[in-house]
Amino acid sequence: MTILPTLHDLPKDQPFVLGIGFFDGCHLGHQEVFSEVKRLAKEKGAQPGVLTFYPHPMKVLAPDIHVPLLQSIDEKMDALAAQGMALAVCIRPDETFLAKSAEDFLGELARLPGLVGLVTGENFSFGHGGLGKSGDLVRFFEESRVTVRIVSLRENAGKKISSTAIRQCILAGEMEQAARFLGHPYTIRGDIVHGFRRGHDVLGFPTANLAVSEDRVLPPDGVYATRALVKGHTFPAITNIGNNPTFGNAKKTIETFIFDFDESIYGASFTLAWVARIRGEMKFASPDLLVAQIHQDIQKAKNRLHV
């Protein structure tokens, strides 16, 4: 997949279809858009692509309001490539871009010589203040070479799928529901860093400590059944996120004990899939009581992971 920083970098002598959206999480609803992009591109003999944005526009419009994200930019690009997109325009929104009127944005799209199709979700908005709606795309391009298709919101068990709904699930620890909306367990990619070594030296459970960006959505503190993707292989695991109150830590950590794994992975890239919440964070009177609880947690995690 070719990643481009602006609309002006798109090919001028080759036709393309663009799906437009922020696409945080690339969830099942977004995947409907990607599928429609590919269908329309095939009809038009064009390349399938997307127009997306990073970081979230709210980071520019209201820096004090924190919008936690489901994906890093690298994870988003990897997901778009996996969905079969050949092109990805990733605009970094600034005050100038966000001040554009809906009419100006439409005019910029219309001046793209290779554009032959646009696909968006029904709740898509654009232009200053979000005044432009998906229906405006249809009306603007209805007598042009550009075919516009609007994709209805997808539902799961009667609930509309959206990035906001998925964030709410994760923040509530409802990892199974988040997975139903995403189409897979929620994942976080980061680097393995050195921790306090209590898991190895005190408790007898060596853990991998995951460093993640501050703008990621994290589940509430507690213990989770997880899967760890390390060096191209996936392993069942158990993860604790929290402040380790038994030891009086102030800093939040994400520590993962990988079952039947004894390799050194410090500094390696690591992807963690959050499968199910086992329990909330607890403070124990002694390390021995914590170890006893960890054994119970591991068994529950293995049962949940079917290992």
What are these regions (language model features)?
Residues F141-N240:
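Glycine-rich, Lys/Arg-enriched anion-binding loops that position phosphate/diphosphate groups
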Residues H27, L80, L118, A178, ...:
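Residue-level signal for inorganic ion chemistry
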Residues G195-V307:
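Phosphate/ribose-recognition catalytic cores of enzymes acting on nucleotide-derived substrates
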Residues I3-D9:
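N-terminal, positively charged, Ser/Thr/Ala/Gly-biased leader segments
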Residues K59-S144:
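N-terminal Rossmann-like or analogous alpha/beta NTP/dinucleotide-binding catalytic cores
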Residues D9-S72:
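N-terminal catalytic cores of NTP/NDP-binding nucleotidyl/phosphoryl-transfer enzymes
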Residues G45-G49, A86-L87, T147:
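Residues at the starts of beta-strands that form the adenosine-phosphate
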